[in-house]
């Protein structure tokens, strides 16, 4: 008999996927989610919120949530992909949806190819150049509705996707690609928040589905109130024009109401994030009490949080970490300048995809120059006051209130200038109260 012992390998215990537990269903809690969604759907219908296609989108999303909720966890994302692709055909039509999917598969094929990363980037730049030519010339035999949707899907998120892909170890996943780019609300909302790829993937069922979905319901409700307020302000401002009111009154109301119309953007962003939450994606807040900002930099952090995070990740941090050895203040100022300049040109790029033409105007240049200059001043002030103990008391609260009022008033004036077609038109408005 052999005395050699046979050593069996010890099997490692499998790590349980906590997301499966977080996707556990509950009839009562499901009903508590479905009831407010039904009320929101009724509100959309009664008040004709947005365009007719929005109601169709909401029906698809809410019905999709009702089905996805009861599916086993492993089937949830495949179902969402099928729902999103089918929704493209329903909302955009056969030709546009088919071309979008074909473009997506072409892009993924390049990304997934085994060639060096720099050559993949070069191929994607070539695809971009062809699309830019098609958008600018209109000579391709494709529907004109294709280009704005294609741009809204890929123009910014592709930058983040490639950045994260370069820094990850594994290959690109087709499932991750489709869930990230073919987001159902994006077919309707062309002005879309720049969702971070890592945040999007990391947030998938990172908390209990009922908690995340309830947050989504709340954000959809908040976005709905923003859109209703936007409609009210938009309709109201036309009543305050000379000779019905004094010129000074008309100018003041128009300036304030023009700034308040940003409620439409924040309302749409809240609804988009809320819809994603229904399917388990724990999305961060898109906007946070931006009318209560105490400075320009505070406003930058609050007004479009996803864009701020996008710029910090792609522009600010790379510049900051390269320059910080030459001085922290210098690194922060240069990083801020690069962020403002990049934001300006990316807004021009966005306008091209949505409208089909480049927009360089004196209003835009002045807006971003003034905003950037004040942001640099704020960076310097924050740097000099860093480390000081925070103060409290009534004088501090009064000063903070004054800062909020001053920031709001200044941004309202600057926003009215930015919204005018030209400086001549803006000066005429300030003089006459008419625009």
Where are these regions (language model features)?
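Membrane-embedded transmembrane alpha-helical bundles that form the catalytic cores
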Residues: 2-435
